[in-house]
Amino acid sequence: MTDAQQSRKPRIALMGEFSAGKSTLSNLLLGGRALPEKVTATRLAPVWMSYGTTPPYRVTLDGGTEPVSLDRLESVPVAETRVIRLFMECDILELCDLIDFPGISDPNMSSDVWERMLPEVDAVLWCTHATQAWRQSEAAVWAMMPDALRDFSILLITRYDKLISDKDRRRVFQRVRLETEGQFAATFPISLLQALQAGDDYDKWDASGAGPFVTHLVDMIDKLTKVAARTDQPLYNIANGTAIPEPVRATIMPRRVQRLRDAAQTDADDTDDPVRASL
């Protein structure tokens, strides 16, 4: 086993339609904003975030690199950029890399902008807006994904609080689960804004739907880390019917992430909500 293989972290993409909550999800996972407030991720090439203090740069289509300024990211030429690389010191990036993709159906952006980054991905956190969940355009893109990637991916029904009645929530959740059966490792309804606003209030955190999601996410990253220790090939590149390397080692999680996982698991075990209890 090479040093490169030992050190490779899982690479998890944040994907979905425009305004489905990807930026809010990124802020939630990172514990803060990765981009300046005036910068809109939907207007950028994919943004690959890793742990560290390296200055930001962009990777050109021919593999070259050029430094970029965080305050001027929107001036980076999207059509000529494969990916923007950002580095931060935060807990989640000690466990994995995050790649924030632009919206999949932006009429002002060619799908080539995000499709060329798919070979770098091990798993996806897919955000679908609760009021128009799992549109045909989303299903069409997801049909491109190989089983190896799907087996570790999570579907988030975002802005779940916008569904007013319990009946509507159950109807949407059941429909999405039926239409995506076998295509994701797990599906969670969630209000990302409520989760962000919860702070250290674990009751509000759990009520937002974030508790069960985070518990599953950390477990999923643990499994992906063991797979990444055996192969430098991201799971998007593993064809259907091809065996995924067996896990070989455990993940050492930062204590803060472990505490968050334990607290989320305790709250999830105590819930009486039949929809969330079924997750």
Annotate each language-model stretch with its function.
Residues 22, 100, 161:
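Acidic active-site catalytic centers that drive phospho-/nucleotidyl reactions
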Residues 1-97:
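Conserved G1/Walker A P-loop phosphate-binding module
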Residues 1-15, 39, 52, 74, ...:
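Extended helical scaffolds that flank P-loop GTPase cores
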Residues 72-96, 106, 112-186:
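Conserved C-terminal guanine-recognition region of P-loop GTPase G domains, centered on the G4
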Residues 17, 51, 129, 158, ...:
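Cofactor-binding loop segments of dinucleotide-utilizing enzymes, especially the Rossmann-like FAD-
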Residues 161-226:
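Canonical P-loop GTPase G-domain recognition
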